[in-house]
């Protein structure tokens, strides 16, 4: 049983970062089949009664940093005979974006679909777009031996967390649809992107998805730069390239260290081979 409110109790150090496949084939499949889930940490939520920012408290797991939130919810048809789903809340509404993505098991068997939605504040069709993103997962009824009764499992996060650390030019090159349909990593976005720990998808939700902390770089692993060291001059377009070391008098493989910069990289292996 879930407590009525507050964080779900989990062992110290527990972090919940399921993959798309795990959400569908383990958690949602067991849910619709009324099977027990070993560690039941996904709450049931009425999506129409909660705003995305309320999920941070309602769906908290443990006491550690968290920047994406998970819950089960019923698909609520907007019209009795229609196929459109009502995802309106008091403050706004969730709007589907892009194309649904098929989710496959390792054996190439399709088990379900992932729909991406963006939260808008206000009333359709004139709402204001926010950074809150939701991935809604549904099972393929043809591929499971259970009766799907309207349950879906959802992951909510904030888009901004995935853009932290990018310069303006890089951010401009990011396509919204690619961002929203990012592959979810089994590690928290906090380890994959830079960001603040409580937003996640930073204030906007991340998959993201995770409130990001700046990734830890081991700068000690990089050689120190000596300002007195002279770098080789890049050759001009009019200057012919020098011959490989083996063609020079007394040339050896160690001569590679004195080659111009354009010889470093993928060509270096060929030059080493020629010099033998």
Swiss-Prot record:
Sample GO molecular function, one term: DNA binding
GO-annotated biological processes: plant-type secondary cell wall biogenesis; regulation of DNA-templated transcription; root cap development
Region (Disordered): 180-253
Bias-annotated ranges (Basic residues): 206-216
Tissues of expression: Expressed in leaf blades, developing flowers, embryo and callus. Weakly expressed in roots.
UniProt keyword terms in alphabetical order: DNA-binding, Nucleus, Stress response, Transcription, Transcription regulation
Record's compositionally biased regions (Basic and acidic residues): 196-205
Subcellular compartments: Nucleus
Assigned GO CC terms: nucleus
Entries under PROSITE patterns matching the protein: NAC
Residues in NAC domain copies: 10-159
Entries under Gene3D superfamilies matching the protein: NAC domain
Domain of life, per lineage: Eukaryota
Disulfide bridges in this chain: none
Domain notes: The NAC domain includes a DNA binding domain and a dimerization domain.
Stored PANTHER family: PROTEIN CUP-SHAPED COTYLEDON 2-RELATED, PROTEIN SOMBRERO-LIKE ISOFORM X2
Role of this protein: Probable transcription factor involved in stress response.
Name under which the protein is recorded: NAC domain-containing protein 76
């Amino acid at each position: 049983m879930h407590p009525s409110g507050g964080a779900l109790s989990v062992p110290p150090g527990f972090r919940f970062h399921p993959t798309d496949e795990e959400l569908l084939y383990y958690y949602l499949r067991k849910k619709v089949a009324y099977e027990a889930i070993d560690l039941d940490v996904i709450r049931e939520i009425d999506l129409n009664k909660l705003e995305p920012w309320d999920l941070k408290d309602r769906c908290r797991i443990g006491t550690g940093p968290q920047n994406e939130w998970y819950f089960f919810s019923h698909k609520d048809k907007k019209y009795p005979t229609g196929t459109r789903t009502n995802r309106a809340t008091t403050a706004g509404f969730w709007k589907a974006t892009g194309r649904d993505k098929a989710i496959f098991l390792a054996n190439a068997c399709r088990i379900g679909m992932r729909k991406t939605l963006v939260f808008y504040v206000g009333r359709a069709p004139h709402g204001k777009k926010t950074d809150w993103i939701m991935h809604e997962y549904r099972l393929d009824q043809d591929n499971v031996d259970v009766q799907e009764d309207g349950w879906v499992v959802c992951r909510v996060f904030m888009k901004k967390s995935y853009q932290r650390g990018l310069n303006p030019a890089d951010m401009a090159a990011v396509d919204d649809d690619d961002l929203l349909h990012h592959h979810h990593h089994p590690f928290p976005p906090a380890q994959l992107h830079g960001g603040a720990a409580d937003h996640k998808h930073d204030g906007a939700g991340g998959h993201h998805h995770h409130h990001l902390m700046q990734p830890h770089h081991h700068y000690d692993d990089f050689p120190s730069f000596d300002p007195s060291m002279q770098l080789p001059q890049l050759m001009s377009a009019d200057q012919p390239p020098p011959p490989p070391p083996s063609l020079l008098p007394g040339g050896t493989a160690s001569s590679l260290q004195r080659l111009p910069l354009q010889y470093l990289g993928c060509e270096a292996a060929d030059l080493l081979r020629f010099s033998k």
